[in-house]
């Protein structure tokens, strides 16, 4: 679990997301409160429930990007889902309980990686011994059993030194490795993924653990043996319990496009993928117990962050019970021309940096001038205003169009430098930006 302070979290998010300070502060406080809660005594800790967040803002302003970056910072079980993928219980489609099942699967994977990393040093020692046993087979007694030697032989120590120095990396050896489990593909109808995974694991267990002799270079064998030995040192039952604890205490669920499951106007007939989904989400957000293949998971202390553009629907169109369970509202602002300029230059891996790096692979040096950046930002903002406002995503469309000619001819331009200034941008984009009909189809 992350121990970063809210200021540190916001500072980290600032490296990738421009503006939206209110949203960054809210998620930073929510993340820090997870850590604060774990410092309380057990009785009080059980009473402190997370304050779920609803992020409201037009498309392309950074809602989903905040979720993506938060997943890396959280160091906790995290899952991002689209609200539109779910249907009401009893209808064809995914049920909302699968959110918690997927979150638990992600937690098991995360905890397994951490456990393997924790045992890595011991696993390396065991893998080294197995390779040395192949290079210098241990002595056997009259009954064909391996004798336990008090001290390793001089030859074994010499080979160990060579192995550690990488002198034997390219030498081929034949070694017994765990065979891959029997793969069984099962095609199941939507909504029955849980049964499918249980059947697959059952068929895999039928085969048992078999060994298979493989001929490999020592450096490749070492990697596989370390993984195999580390997996043996991990207790599967303990791992499952740790994963469930991690989900229950630190789990974070990000639900995107929640505005798409709002009921719009008066409609007759069942609304199975809108209001029905909201009703099914209620117990999860409020706190219930969900059955997963790893065990029962309580959702009382899982943090839910929902987001939506709410361009047609309004937050008040959500059913009242769900509104009450999303107490923190954060409004994200529409992006301006100056925001677009900052997006093109400030983030660690901004779009302009990506294009420069891609063209550098062909030996072409691209330089974006300040006037060029400003003109690109103005063009993107202008197209957003005259057609549909898709926020920062418009920059990708505009830049792709601008760089199309260079990308096509890059292999013939090796060794050249190209400067993208205001004149270059105007020459390639002005006609398209000015013609609204062309903008709708091309930009």
From Swiss-Prot:
Which positions are annotated as binding ATP?
18, 60-65, 256, 321, 393
- Look up keyword Transport and say if it applies: no
**SUPFAM superfamilies under this entry?**
P-loop containing nucleoside triphosphate hydrolases
Q: How does it assemble?
A: A double ring-shaped homohexamer of HslV is capped on each side by a ring-shaped HslU homohexamer. The assembly of the HslU/HslV complex is dependent on binding of ATP.
Function of the protein? ATPase subunit of a proteasome-like degradation complex; this subunit has chaperone activity. The binding of ATP and its subsequent hydrolysis by HslU are essential for unfolding of protein substrates subsequently hydrolyzed by HslV. HslU recognizes the N-terminal part of its protein substrates and unfolds these before they are guided to HslV for hydrolysis.
Matching entries from InterPro entries are given as: AAA+_ATPase, ATP-dep_Clp_protease_ClpX, ATPase_AAA_core, Clp_ATPase_C, HslU, P-loop_NTPase
Location in the cell: Cytoplasm
Induction of expression: By heat shock.
Family label:
Belongs to the ClpX chaperone family. HslU subfamily.
The terms describing its cellular component in GO are:
HslUV protease complex
Q: Which UniProt keywords apply?
A: ATP-binding, Chaperone, Cytoplasm, Nucleotide-binding, Stress response
GO biological process, any: proteolysis involved in protein catabolic process
Which Gene Ontology molecular-function terms are recorded? ATP binding; ATP hydrolysis activity; peptidase activity; proteasome-activating activity
Name of the protein in question:
ATP-dependent protease ATPase subunit HslU
């Amino acid at each position: 679990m992350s121990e970063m302070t809210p200021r540190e979290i916001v500072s980290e998010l600032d490296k990738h997301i421009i503006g939206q300070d209110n949203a960054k502060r809210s998620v930073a406080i929510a993340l820090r409160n997870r850590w604060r809660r774990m410092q309380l005594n057990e009785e009080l800790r059980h009473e402190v429930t997370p304050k779920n967040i609803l992020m409201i803002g037009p498309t392309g302003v950074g809602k989903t990007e905040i979720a993506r970056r938060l997943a890396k910072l959280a160091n906790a079980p995290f899952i991002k889902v689209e609200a539109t993928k779910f249907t009401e219980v009893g209808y064809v489609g995914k049920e909302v309980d699968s959110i918690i099942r997927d979150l638990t699967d992600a937690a098991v994977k995360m905890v397994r990686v951490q456990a393997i990393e924790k045992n890595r040093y011991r696993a390396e020692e065991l893998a080294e011994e197995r390779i040395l046993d192949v290079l210098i087979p241990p002595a056997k007694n009259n009954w064909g059993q391996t004798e336990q030697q008090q001290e390793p032989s001089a030859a074994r120590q010499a080979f160990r030194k060579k192995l550690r120095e990488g002198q034997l990396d390219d030498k081929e050896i034949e070694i017994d490795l765990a065979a891959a489990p029997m793969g069984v593909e099962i095609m199941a109808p939507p909504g029955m993924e849980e049964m499918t995974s249980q059947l697959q694991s059952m068929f895999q267990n039928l085969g048992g653990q078999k060994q298979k002799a493989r001929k490999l270079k020592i450096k490749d064998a070492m990697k596989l043996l370390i993984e195999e030995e580390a997996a043996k040192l991990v207790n599967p039952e303990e791992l499952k319990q740790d994963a469930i604890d991690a989900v229950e205490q630190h789990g974070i669920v990000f639900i995107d496009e929640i505005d798409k499951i709002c009921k719009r106007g008066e409609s007759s007939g069942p609304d199975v993928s809108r209001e029905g989904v909201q009703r099914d989400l209620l117990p999860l957000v409020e706190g219930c117990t969900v059955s997963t293949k790893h065990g029962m998971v309580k959702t009382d202390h899982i943090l839910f962050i929902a987001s939506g553009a709410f361009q047609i629907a309004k937050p008040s169109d959500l059913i009242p019970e769900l509104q009450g369970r999303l107490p923190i509202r954060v409004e994200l602002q529409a992006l301006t021309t100056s925001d677009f300029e900052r997006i093109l230059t400030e983030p660690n891996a901004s779009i302009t940096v990506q294009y420069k790096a891609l063209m550098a692979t062909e030996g072409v040096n691209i330089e974006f001038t300040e006037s060029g950046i400003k003109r690109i930002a103005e063009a993107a903002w202008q197209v957003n205003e005259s057609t549909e406002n898709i926020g920062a995503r418009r920059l990708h469309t505009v830049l792709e169009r601008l760089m199309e000619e260079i990308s096509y001819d890059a292999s013939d331009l090796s060794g050249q430098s190209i400067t993208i200034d205001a004149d270059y941008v105007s020459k390639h984009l002005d006609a398209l930006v000015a013609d609204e009909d062309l903008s709708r189809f091309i930009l």
